[in-house]
């Protein structure tokens, strides 16, 4: 009995220690300053030579903080609100980073809001359709942010992804009402459920617009659950024509593995395959797993597991391990931000992205490789092929 009790105590102690370090990081992160709404107020400054100006369109279920404001808070709105922002990215910008202003925004070194305006639905659609960059149709890229994110953080992250990708697609942020608090995990779960129908509305709007070309929708963290649920709902309501036009990417999905399996069973195979970006050392997802009763999260699965490999092929999903990419955040949860600049933009280079199965993102040449190919390089001391 004593040995059994001692073993149980040791197990609890180990579990506590495994959680303690991430928990301390979370506490420290909570003490850090967060960007406020003042960053969204266009100042007297203009963009400078060498800066890049990007346009971000917004569809949101967040409340407006004032009747005449283009700033959004954490409360929920049943109706979509639309807006447009122009953001200047400094000439000194480093890939995947957001250069937050320290004091008065300076376009020489900071991200700066140049303009903002509210739109109605007709203006929103027309403005996006006009982002065709000389092509017959306008491509669209939709970003769905994750847990513990305020509006300005989501907006500037979308601007960073847009600028680093050098894509000419119209960039759209779907902003759901996150509490922007580390204690708001359950509230955020409710908020993504609250927003599901409105994301379906946005995707349907684009998917049935003949003046829209390709549609890429990328979810991050808890935003992946919202994205997957929206696609599932499109399937359940017979909107297969909309689904056929979507390219779905889930980055570090904070989704229970069993829940994801059920979602995928309804969604079915996509063409191109749904892409899932994972990293087994994601600290944020390890905390999520712990507080969810040790239920494994999709974004932290181990691609060397034969069961994972078989499941990916069977479900026609591309699982991409991005653990080789540098992590800019303490929680190793935002690696996907590096992908914007590294993903091939030439269609001829994107052939691997249409294959189902498990792959590792090889930073040498920005290509995909099987985990076994990379392992053989390590054992053999080889370089790039």
Describe each model-derived feature in a short phrase.
Residues 32, 36-115, 128-130, 134-135, ...:
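Lipolytic serine-hydrolase domain surface
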């Amino acid at each position: 009995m004593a040995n059994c009790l001692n073993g149980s105590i040791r197990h609890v102690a180990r579990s506590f220690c495994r959680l303690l370090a991430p928990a301390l990081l979370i506490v420290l992160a909570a003490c850090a300053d967060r960007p406020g709404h003042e960053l969204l107020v266009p100042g007297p400054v203009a963009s400078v030579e060498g800066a890049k100006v990007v346009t971000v369109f917004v569809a949101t279920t967040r409340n407006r903080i004032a009747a005449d404001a283009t700033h959004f808070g954490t409360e929920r709105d049943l109706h979509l609100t639309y807006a447009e922002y122009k953001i200047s990215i400094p000439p000194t910008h480093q890939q995947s980073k957001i250069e937050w202003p320290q004091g008065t925004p300076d376009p020489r070194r900071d991200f700066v809001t140049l303009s903002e305006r509210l739109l109605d639905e007709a203006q929103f659609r027309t403005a996006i359709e006009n982002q065709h960059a000389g092509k017959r149709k306008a491509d669209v890229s939709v970003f769905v942010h994750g847990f513990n994110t305020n509006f300005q953080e989501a907006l500037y992250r979308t601007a960073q992804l847009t600028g680093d990708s050098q894509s000419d697609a119209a960039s759209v942020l779907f902003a759901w009402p996150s509490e922007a608090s580390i204690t708001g995990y359950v509230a955020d779960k409710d908020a993504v459920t609250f927003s599901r129908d409105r994301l379906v509305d946005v995707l349907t709007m684009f998917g049935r617009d003949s003046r829209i070309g390709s549609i890429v929708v990328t979810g991050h963290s808890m935003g992946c659950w919202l994205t997957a649920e929206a696609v599932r709902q499109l399937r359940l309501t017979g909107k297969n024509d909309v689904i056929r036009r979507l390219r779905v990417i889930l980055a570090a999905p904070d989704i229970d593995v069993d829940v994801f399996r059920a979602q995928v069973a309804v969604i079915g195979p996509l063409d191109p395959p749904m892409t899932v970006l994972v990293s087994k050392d994601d600290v944020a997802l390890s905390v999520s797993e712990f507080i969810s009763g040790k239920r494994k999260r999709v974004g932290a699965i181990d691609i060397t597991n034969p069961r994972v490999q078989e499941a990916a092929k069977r479900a026609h999903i591309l699982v991409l391990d991005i653990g080789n990419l540098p992590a800019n955040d303490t929680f190793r949860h935002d690696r996907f931000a590096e992908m914007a600049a590294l993903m091939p933009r030439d269609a001829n280079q994107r052939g691997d992205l249409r294959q189902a199965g498990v792959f590792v993102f090889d930073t040498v040449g920005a290509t995909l490789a099987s985990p076994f190919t990379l392992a053989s390089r390590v054992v053999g001391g080889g370089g790039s092929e």
